[in-house]
């Protein structure tokens, strides 16, 4: 009897963790956007006015719980919890709940960035949070939860990143490290996550997951509630979980410890796609992109060109400040059949600590748009760049098709088909791409969705004529604004 019961428990745990890889997208939608530091009311409006109509699948939102107030209001204060009250500069609980409902109503899921590893960093004296809660971080006292010193690991620094004990029990950049093996801590974290599930979220991005033991996270994930059916989720649906695990391939704490619990952020994807489109690697090598490069299995990998952390670091990672290469890399990301895709929506920054756009009272301001829909007041809004939202539509149009008919020039001009539904070509050389190429599309005239749109039966940008054999003449000049061309069946004239 005991062996049978144990087997049943193991089977249930396995099925539960597999379910945590399902993002619960509507229809053929399959791209998440990170609206970094946006207010809840603005996200609700964006879901209704832009994300839903453009076919985005979901939004990753900034941390929702009360955080410490830091001088100058740097973005990273959101990653220093004071309590689990749902009051931040993005809004209060009522505004958050309204946003979740309105986004779900138009088929856009909400994924919350959650902080289960730690509370705030050190602070002289009494710290005050965004909901007015007081805490004394130096004594590990957080009455708003409440947590006291016994709920944390003993203080120590991470000096050796190859020491598992230090990585998982010492303080990440001085942040007070919670003990997730404690029943009390587990109960408070589960209570917090369950409340968000009740409000209708579809899942969680788990910050600093590698700094928590996989066994502790497994317990927490398996104990939280099923998704709320009142928000359109099926019965017994589990929250989608994607975990921040930075693993460059030589880490003592590896991504493979977490990829069965949920998806994992594939940081090597970000680094290598940046290398390629910066010209440090020929694009021809991208034919084997994905697992052929040693990345995680497609359904386990949360993929991105940049995120809110690494876009601020020097190195190979691309960001909005290199727009041509960034748009090419994003087009490839969304066209190639690998990973669970997330695109970034940033605000402008001059240094690592730059605050989001705010007024004189340090209140986050709403994005404003020009006549073409681009943001103009400190918000970058890459997701509103035509070259990016058009590729979200491309990805929807080609969902569940295979890559075929790869072509390259032996260097950094490439093209490929997605079944008979889509075609992408990229030119990252310093000379023109002018070639008859197999598009795999039915005969007809197609709009290049990178440079224009299909409006009232005609293209606002350039078009490509595809013959009865599927071939079309493709031209991408070396000096062209975008360096990429994309055709799909939903943009046929």
UniProtKB/Swiss-Prot annotation:
The active site is at residues 207, 244. GO terms for molecular function: 4-alpha-glucanotransferase activity; alpha-amylase activity; metal ion binding. GO terms for biological process: carbohydrate metabolic process. It is found in: Secreted. SUPFAM superfamilies: (Trans)glycosidases (SSF51445), Glycosyl hydrolase domain (SSF51011). It catalyses: Endohydrolysis of (1->4)-alpha-D-glucosidic linkages in polysaccharides containing three or more (1->4)-alpha-linked D-glucose units. GO terms for cellular component: extracellular region. The modification Pyrrolidone carboxylic acid is found at residue 20. Disulfide bonds join 47-103, 156-170, 375-381, 417-440, 447-459. Ca(2+) binds at residues 117, 168, 177, 211. Residues 1-19 form the signal peptide. Its cofactor is Ca(2+); chloride. Its main location: secreted. It comes from the Eukaryota. This is Alpha-amylase-related protein. It comes from Drosophila ananassae (Fruit fly). The lineage of its organism: Eukaryota, Metazoa, Ecdysozoa, Arthropoda, Hexapoda. The gene is Amyrel.
């Amino acid at each position: 009897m005991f062996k049978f019961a144990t087997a049943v428990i193991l089977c249930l745990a396995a099925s539960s963790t597999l379910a945590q890889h399902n993002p619960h997208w509507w229809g053929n939608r399959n791209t998440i956007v990170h609206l970094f530091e946006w207010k809840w009311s603005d996200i609700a409006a964006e879901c209704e006015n832009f994300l839903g109509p453009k076919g985005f699948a979901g939004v990753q939102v900034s941390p929702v719980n009360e955080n410490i107030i830091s001088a100058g209001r740097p973005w990273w204060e959101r990653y220093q919890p004071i309590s689990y009250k749902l009051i931040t500069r993005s809004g209060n609980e009522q505004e958050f709940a309204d946003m979740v409902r309105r986004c779900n109503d138009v088929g856009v899921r909400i994924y919350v960035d959650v902080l289960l590893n730690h509370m705030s960093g050190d602070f002289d004296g009494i710290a005050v949070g965004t909901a007015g809660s007081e805490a004394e971080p130096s004594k590990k006292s957080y009455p708003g939860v409440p947590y006291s010193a016994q709920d944390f690991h003993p203080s120590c620094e991470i000096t050796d990143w190859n020491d598992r004990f230090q990585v998982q029990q010492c303080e990440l950049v001085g942040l007070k490290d919670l003990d997730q093996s404690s029943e009390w801590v587990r109960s408070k974290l589960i209570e917090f996550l369950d409340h968000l599930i009740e409000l209708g979220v579809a899942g969680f991005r788990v910050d600093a997951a590698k700094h928590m033991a996989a066994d502790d996270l497994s317990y927490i994930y398996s104990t939280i509630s099923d998704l709320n059916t009142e928000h359109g989720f099926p019965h017994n649906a589990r929250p989608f979980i994607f975990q921040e695990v930075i693993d460059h391939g030589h880490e003592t704490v590896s991504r493979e410890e977490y990829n069965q619990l949920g998806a994992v952020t594939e940081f090597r994807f970000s680094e290598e796609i940046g290398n390629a489109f910066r010209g440090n690697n020929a694009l021809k090598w991208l034919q084997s992109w994905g697992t052929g490069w040693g990345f995680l299995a497609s359904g386990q990998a949360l993929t991105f060109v940049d995120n809110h952390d690494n876009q601020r670091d020097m190195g190979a990672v691309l960001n909005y400040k290199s727009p041509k290469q960034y748009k090419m890399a994003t087009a490839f990301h969304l066209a190639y059949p690998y990973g669970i895709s997330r695109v970034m929506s940033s605000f402008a920054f001059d240094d690592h600590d730059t605050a989001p756009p705010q007024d004189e009272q340090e209140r986050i301001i709403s994005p404003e748009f020009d006549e073409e829909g681009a943001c103009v007041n400190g918000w970058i809004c890459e997701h509103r760049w035509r070259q990016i939202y058009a590729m979200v539509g491309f990805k929807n149009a080609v969902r569940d098709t295979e890559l075929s008919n790869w072509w390259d020039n032996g260097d950094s001009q490439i093209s490929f088909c997605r079944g008979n539904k889509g075609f992408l070509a990229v030119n990252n050389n310093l000379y023109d791409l002018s070639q008859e190429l197999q598009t795999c599309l039915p005969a007809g005239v197609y709009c290049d969705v990178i440079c224009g749109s299909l409006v009232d039966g005609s293209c606002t940008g350039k078009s490509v004529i595809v013959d009865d054999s599927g071939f079309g003449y493709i031209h991408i000049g070396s000096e062209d604004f975008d360096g990429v061309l994309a055709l799909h069946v939903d943009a046929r004239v």
